[in-house]
Amino acid sequence: SDFVVEHDMDTSPLGDPVGMISGINIVDIPADGELADKICAAAEGVGGIRCVKGKIASGDCFVNSAEKKKYISETFGAIACEMEGAAIGHVCYVNKVSFCVIRAISDAADGSSHMDYSKFTALAAKNSAAVMTELLRSGK
């Protein structure tokens, strides 16, 4: 990630932009770009893993419709959607702790997924461990 956003935050009736987190008054929470670069370099070192940096949107529901996916992509400029990363980013931002969200993408979030969830989680865990091992091994 280079940013995270909470796509389900909406205090727009009060005049705020959609996604604004009250109290810290921010929509796009910045991740650690240098760490993201190092993680992508480690993924390239492992091979067979595509690393894409961009904004990740988080919310309180699974996104499984093309309509919702389009709304999140167009409203926030997100390249991926999930349920945890922005909450972690929010806590890190408030406490001045660097972070970077890494996601393994299982489907297109449009209702077309046919991947077996248990097979995907095993592959995602294996790839994540390989990338983190390479990151630590490279000393970058």
How should these model regions be labeled?
Residues S1-K140:
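Glycine-rich phosphate- or other oxyanion-binding loops that anchor nucleotides, phosphorylated ligands
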